[in-house]
Amino acid sequence: MFFGGEGSLTYTLVIICFLTLRLSASQNCLKKSLEDVVIDIQSSLSKGIRGNEPVYTSTQEDCINSCCSTKNISGDKACNLMIFDTRKTARQPNCYLFFCPNEEACPLKPAKGLMSYRIITDFPSLTRNLPSQELPQEDSLLHGQFSQAVTPLAHHHTDYSKPTDISWRDTLSQKFGSSDHLEKLFKMDEASAQLLAYKEKGHSQSSQFSSDQEIAHLLPENVSALPATVAVASPHTTSATPKPATLLPTNASVTPSGTSQPQLATTAPPVTTVTSQPPTTLISTVFTRAAATLQAMATTAVLTTTFQAPTDSKGSLETIPFTEISNLTLNTGNVYNPTALSMSNVESSTMNKTASWEGREASPGSSSQGSVPENQYGLPFEKWLLIGSLLFGVLFLVIGLVLLGRILSESLRRKRYSRLDYLINGIYVDI
C-alpha cells in the first residue's frame, strides 16, 4: 500500500513537472500567427531552409511548444517557424517544423486551412533602410516579414495575416521596452501610412486643379475671331451700335453663316450681324468674284465660318470689324485664293466701334497656325484609316474567293466508288 501510494505520488510529480515545463516553454516562446499561409517550398529550398519530418499533435499549442523546444533541426538548428495543418485528421502528421536562416529565405503564399507561426524570440532580425522612412530594429522585429513598412512582400500578404495571439505584447514589452513605446511604434506606422495616403490624394487633387487652371487660361487665349467675317464671336456680350464701323452700299449685302461647336461645356458666344445702311464714309474692301473659307480651330471651340460673295456687277463687299488697322494680310494653307485685305488709314473720329473686345485683339496668324497642326495630324490618320480599311476589304475578298473556289473544286471533283459502294447501292435499289 505504501509503495502504491509512493508510486502514484511520483507519477503525479512527474506529470506536474512536465506540465510546468510545457507552460513555461509556451509562455517564453514569443510567436506571431499567420493564418491561411504556407511556405513557398520551391523558392525556399535554394535559400537555406531546413525542416524535420512532420509529426502529429492534437492542438496548435502542442505544435507551437514542440517548435519552441526543438533545437536539433539539421544538427543544431533551432525551430523558428512552424505550420499546423488543420485539414489533417485521424492522427495524420499535421505539425511541420522549419528553420529559416533569415526572413527572405521563407517567403509565404496563401493556402486555406493552414496556420503558420513565427517564433520571434530566436528569429534573426533584418534591418532595412527605406527611402521614405527608417524603422528601428525593434520595429522590424515587431512587424517581421509581413509589415508594410519593412518589406515589399508585406503589401501582397497583409490580407492573409490575422494575428490571433495577444499575449506576445507583454513579453515583447519586457524585452524591448515599455508598452508605451510599442504603442508609439504602432501609431507611428499608422500615421506614416495615413500621411502617405493624404499626400498622394492631395497630389492628385492639385494636379487636377492645375489642369483645370491651364484649361481656364487657354480659354481666353485660344479663342480667336475671323477678321474677314461680319459675325463677331467673343466670350463677352457685344452690342451693335446704330452706326456700324464699316458701312455697306444698299445694293449689296453679305450673309455670314457661323457655326460654333464648343468642345467644353461653355456658353455659346453671341453673334453680332452688321446690317447695311447708306454710306457716309466709304471704308470697305472690294473683292472681285472670290470665295474664301477660313477655319479657326481652338482648344475650347471650333468655329467654322463660310462666307460667299454675291455675283454682282459691282463686286461683293466685305467688312472688317476693326477700327485702327492699316494693312492686314491673311495667309492660310487651306484657302485656294489667298486674299490680301488692304485698308486706308481710318480716323477714329469718323467711326464708331461695332464690337468691344475689352483688351483682346484677335490674331489671324495664331488661328491659321493652330489649324495647321490639326490638318497635319488629321490627314495621316485619315490616310492610314483608309489604307487599313482597304487592306481588310482585300483580305476578306481573298478569303471569300478561296472558300468559294474550294467548294467549287470539291463539287466538280469526281468521287471514286468501290465495289462495296456499288453493292450497297444495288441493295438499296432492290429494296
Swiss-Prot record:
Q: Which residues are glycosylated?
A: 72, 222, 251, 327, 352
Q: What ranges are annotated Cytoplasmic (topological domains)?
A: 409-431
Please state the protein's primary subcellular location: membrane
Q: Where is the composition biased (Low complexity)?
A: 262-277
**SMART domains tied to this protein:** MANEC (SM00765)
Compartments, record wording: Membrane
Disordered as annotated region, ranges? 234-277, 352-372
Which spans are transmembrane here? 386-408
Q: Which InterPro entries match?
A: MANSC_dom, MANSC_N
GO cellular component, alphabetical, reads:
Golgi apparatus; membrane
Bilayer topology:
Single-pass type I membrane protein
Q: Which UniProt keywords apply?
A: Glycoprotein, Membrane, Signal, Transmembrane, Transmembrane helix
Going by the entry's taxonomy, the superkingdom of the source organism is recorded as Eukaryota
Tissue specificity, in the record's words, reads: Widely expressed.
Describe the location of the MANSC domain by residue ranges. Answer: 33-117
Q: Which residues lie on this side of the membrane: Extracellular?
A: 27-385
Biased segments, Polar residues type:
248-261
State what protein this is by name. Answer: MANSC domain-containing protein 1
| Organism encoding this protein | Homo sapiens
